[in-house]
From Swiss-Prot:
GO molecular function: ATP binding; UMP kinase activity
Catalytic reactions of this protein: UMP + ATP = UDP + ADP
Any single GO BP term: UDP biosynthetic process
Binding site for ATP: 10-13, 53, 57, 161, 167, 170
Annotated protein name in UniProt: Uridylate kinase
Subcellular location: Cytoplasm
Subunit structure: Homohexamer.
UniProt xrefs under NCBIfam families: pyrH_bact
Keywords: Allosteric enzyme, ATP-binding, Cytoplasm, Kinase, Nucleotide-binding, Pyrimidine biosynthesis, Transferase
Family statement: Belongs to the UMP kinase family.
Transferase is among the record's keywords: yes
Residues that hold UMP according to the record: 52, 72, 133-140
Any Pfam family: AA_kinase
């Protein structure tokens, strides 16, 4: 029995890099794919949004004096590279997967078409949304919120790299930091908790989409969240 039937899984680029912090670490992405396969076998419809921070970060562009829009487009291309790597790992484990990009590159992926994405999900295929929203100035967190609203997802799963939930402060720097079990999107905005940017939080709140923040590095955690086990922090869509 699962709590969520259709999910958007947000995976940061850094999570794919493991301890290396850069690039794609083969054992790490294989382990993530295995966790996704476990959830797929439950009959859950899975859409994924990948970040690109393991390949390109906006700060690098800023240091180079690059225009923000140009740097953002480079970040979008980085997410496509991550999506293709994850697709390959999933399919090698027997999970049918499609990549859809917000910027057309038909030789390697389908263009994003909402109805087609939903059809893939209904047929039991994992869909990876790459290329962000296709527009600069929008984060991949906002992409996750946007795609979740478009496909009617029950929840966004924010799979974090060695972070097991939302805290009142950085637990690595503040010994008095308190972990929250549940919050609302308005709490996130008012307390400035940096779970996701304000655009993504507002979009999730306006469309009544729940969010679960949890540690991706603990094997089996994606499955536990989908089954409704109390791990991480749950952020309710309603304010």
């Amino acid at each position: 029995m699962v709590k969520y039937n259709r999910i958007v899984l947000k995976i940061s680029g850094e999570a794919l890099a493991g301890e290396a912090g850069f690039g794609i670490k083969p054992p790490v992405i294989a382990t993530i794919a295995k966790q996704i396969k476990e959830v797929h076998e439950l009959g859950v419809q899975i859409a994924i949004v990948c970040g690109g921070g393991n390949i390109w970060r906006g700060e690098t562009g800023a240091e180079m004096g690059m225009e923000r829009a140009q740097a953002d487009y480079m970040g979008m291309l980085a997410t496509v590279m991550n999506a293709l790597a994850l697709q390959d790992n999933l399919e090698s484990q027997g999970v049918p997967t499609r990549v859809q990009t917000s910027i057309e590159m038909r030789q390697i992926a389908e263009p994003y078409i909402r109805r087609k994405a939903i059809r893939h999900l209904e047929k039991g295929r994992v869909v990876i949304f790459a290329g962000g929203t296709g527009n600069p100035y929008f984060s991949t967190d906002t992409t996750a919120a946007l795609r979740a609203a478009e496909i009617g997802a029950d929840v966004i799963l924010m799979a974090k790299n060695n972070v097991d939930g939302v805290y009142s402060a950085d637990p690595n720097k503040d010994t008095h930091a308190v972990k929250y079990e549940s919050l609302t999107h308005m709490d996130i905005i008012n307390k400035d908790l940096k779970v996701m940017d304000s655009t993504a939080s507002t979009l999730s709140m306006d469309n009544d989409i729940d969010l679960v923040v949890f540690n991706l590095n603990e094997p089996g955690n994606i499955k536990r969240v989908v089954e409704g086990q109390k791990i991480g922090t749950t952020i309710e869509g309603r304010s």
